[in-house]
Curated annotation (Swiss-Prot):
It is found in: Mitochondrion inner membrane. This is Cytochrome c oxidase subunit 3. GO terms for cellular component: mitochondrial inner membrane; respiratory chain complex IV. It comes from Loxodonta africana (African elephant). Belongs to the cytochrome c oxidase subunit 3 family. GO terms for molecular function: cytochrome-c oxidase activity.
Length: 261
């Protein structure tokens, strides 16, 4: 092994970006097959490949950052910039969906009866399950902040409790969203209202599932004493991501559920 005279991490070749990209292709193709041909084989293959990739990629990053000490302060600063850019790209991703919604709702076309919501579509009551979902996500934002402050103060017990509550709130939100989809009187095929509603809320729900998985990984790592008060960027990135999901939901609730109804 050659002697390293700098603080940067020279990453070893890894197969996980390739398998991750292939699993994403399999999942999107599998979704198309499921929607049109009611076949879940390709979707299940993509999900399995994606879960295996996540597990092994996270394992390698934990080894490099926690056990081998490659995540120096300089590397952590670069990772922070990377996470900020990633969240910025996610903001632009959701901007497209909000643009589609406002483009259609602010000036409804004659095909929609020049009316919003379109005639025949009965939107969900924003003061029922959507308001409960808003409360759940806002509460999870409080608990993730509690977990972060507990970690900074070296209070491991409180950190684990707060993080577990956040994960459970994320799971509860997902279950409520599934119930809402089941009870909705319209589908993704019901014109521009149905498509913008389900695509926007669906992608947000997917981000909640990803965020919950991220937090669950941090919970397991904290059980194994991986985090300290001054070396915990993995958890910090998960907290940033979770706050981003919270903010997107607030815009989504105010735009689609409350104003759009």
């Amino acid at each position: 092994m050659t002697h390293q005279t700098h603080a940067y991490h020279m990453v070893d070749p890894s197969p996980w970006p390739l398998t991750g990209a292939l699993s994403a292709l399999l999942m999107t193709s599998g979704l198309t097959m499921w929607f049109h041909y009611h076949s879940v084989t390709l979707l299940l293959l993509g999900l399995t490949t994606n879960i295996l990739t996540m597990f092994q990629w996270w394992r390698d990053v934990v080894r490099e950052g926690t056990f081998q000490g490659h995540h120096t302060p300089v590397v952590q600063e670069s990772l922070r910039y990377g996470m900020i850019l990633f969240i910025t790209s996610e903001v632009l991703f959701f901007t497209g969906f909000f643009w589609a919604f406002y483009h259609s709702s602010l000036a409804p076309t004659p095909e929609l009866g020049s009316y919003w919501p379109p005639v025949g579509v009965y939107p969900l009551n924003p003061l029922e399950v959507p308001l409960l979902n808003t409360s759940v996500l806002l509460a999870s934002g409080v608990t993730i902040t509690w977990a972060h402050h507990s970690l900074m103060e070296g209070n491991r017990k409180n950190m684990l409790q707060a993080l577990l509550i956040t994960i459970l709130l994320g799971v509860y939100f997902t279950l409520l969203q599934m119930f809402e989809y089941y009870e909705a009187s319209f589908t993704i095929s019901d014109g521009i209202y149905g498509s913008t509603f389900f695509v926007t809320t669906g992608f947000h729900g997917l981000h909640v599932i990803i965020g919950s998985t991220f937090l669950l990984t941090c919970f397991i790592r904290q059980l194994k004493f991986h985090f300290t008060s001054n070396h915990h960027f993995g958890f910090e990135a998960a907290a940033w991501y979770w706050h981003f999901v919270d903010v997107v939901w607030l815009f989504l609730y105010l735009s689609i559920y409350w104003w759009g109804s």
